[in-house]
Design a protein with these regions (language model features):
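C-terminal catalytic/acceptor-binding lobe
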Residues: 2-7, 12-62, 73, 78-99, ...
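Conserved catalytic core of nucleotide-sugar-dependent glycosyltransferases
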Residues: 9-11, 166, 172-174, 179-183, ...
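Acidic, Ser/Thr-rich intrinsically disordered and amphipathic helical segments
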Residues: 17-22, 126, 137-140, 144, ...
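Active-site beta-to-alpha loop of glycosyltransferases that engages the nucleotide-sugar donor
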Residues: 76, 117-122, 129-140, 164-166
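Short N-terminal or domain-adjacent regulatory/targeting segments
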Residues: 89-118
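Short, well-formed alpha-helical segments that are part of the catalytic scaffolds
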Residues: 105-114, 134-149
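Residue-level recognition of beta-strand->loop/alpha-helix junctions
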Residues: 111, 160-162, 279
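Hydrophobic targeting segments
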Residues: 123-130, 145, 157-160, 178
Length: 346
């Protein structure tokens, strides 16, 4: 019995060692078999889904955190008063000035249109200039008007409306045409009806529309910087789309010089609107001297036509403006619209 107990303990230990040895052998065999299987198996191509997932992971790793992302800043509205305004500026009318010179000074203008790059303009403005045989005056005006409007931080475009042929000049009808053509390009907020021979002297005379029709030429050098006469509403005026539609635009029947601006004033008054003006020390213009144009003689019939305005304004204006477009050309500094507008009725 004493001999039997030691033998039993010894056998039990060997039994444990045997179980442990067998277990380790099995694990070693499994590991060896798995490694050989992986090595000997053919390489399988990655699935498209695997590649996409890998790309997504790579993109996520390469993408900086949100606070490092560079997104373009949102444009804010331009200030009520532009910080670029200079006030009264000295005007020069160089005889050597060329169109290329003016284009070179206004690189930000494309096809007559400009928009501030650093803020959103408070109003979009179409400047309409009736024209015939006044190339030098137009050049001087463009040279000063483009930087003038840019300093005011406006979104604007300039339209030059040329009367084709040699019939008597009709400023008012050309302005109706300019208005209708400009609206084909953009839904402008404000329209500036601008004579080609008047150059603004002070950029605080801001070319935007008001709640009432606005007259911008309070004084000019030719009149000692005084209003030409009480009720004068010519030279340069500003009206919104709604205001201009409300009066049915200009009359189409004023051939030759004079009367059409007074007709527009009567239309404004008939609609119970009030003409507003900037301060006299700001609304100043230089009129570039010129002789009376051939084909733009004084309209001797203007007083008779003015007497009929209250009777005919509803059917004589934008709704009766007929014309034929001869040429529409988008030049660097302005949109040229050449039209045939007919002849005066005898």
């Amino acid at each position: 019995m004493g001999f039997y107990l030691p033998v039993t303990k010894t056998l039990r230990r060997w039994k444990y060692f045997l179980v442990l040895f067998v277990s380790l052998s099995v694990l070693a065999w499994i590991a060896t078999f798995s490694g050989e299987t992986v090595k000997s198996g053919p390489a399988l191509p990655a699935s498209p889904q695997t590649l996409v997932q890998a790309d997504v992971v790579k993109d996520r790793l390469d993408t900086p955190p949100p606070d490092r992302l560079t997104t373009p800043p949102q444009k804010v509205e331009c200030p009520q008063e532009s910080p670029l305004l200079q006030g009264a500026v000295k005007l020069s009318f160089e005889s050597s000035l060329t169109l290329k010179d003016v284009e070179g000074r206004n690189k930000g203008v494309s096809e007559g249109e400009y928009e501030p790059s650093d803020c959103t303009a408070r109003q979009s403005v179409a400047v309409l200039i009736p024209h015939r045989s006044r190339e030098r005056h137009l050049l001087y005006l463009l040279n000063h008007l483009h930087p003038f409007l840019q300093r005011q931080q406006l979104h604007y475009a300039i339209y030059v409306i040329q009367q084709a042929g040699d019939a008597t000049f009709n400023r008012a009808k050309l302005l109706n045409v300019g208005y209708l053509e400009a609206l084909k390009d953009y839904s402008w907020d404000c329209f500036i009806f601008h004579d080609v021979d008047l150059v603004p002297e002070n950029d605080h005379n801001v070319y935007v529309c008001d709640k009432q029709p606005k007259h911008l030429v309070v004084g000019r050098n030719a009149t000692g910087y005084k209003l030409r006469y009480k009720g004068y509403f010519g030279g340069v005026t500003a009206m919104t789309r709604d205001q201009f539609h409300q009066v049915n635009g200009f009359s189409n029947t004023y051939w030759g010089w004079g009367g059409e601006d007074d007709d527009l004033r009567i239309r404004v008054e008939l609609q119970k609107m009030t003409i507003v003006r900037p301060p006299a020390d700001i609304a100043r213009y230089t009129m570039v001297f010129h002789k009376r144009d051939s084909g733009n003689e004084i309209n001797k019939d203007r007083m008779r036509l003015l007497g009929r305005t209250p009777l005919v304004w509803k059917k004589d204006g934008l709704n009766s403006c007929s014309y034929e477009t001869v040429l529409l050309e988008r030049q660097p500094l302005y949109v040229n619209v050449t039209v045939e507008i007919g002849k005066p009725q005898n």
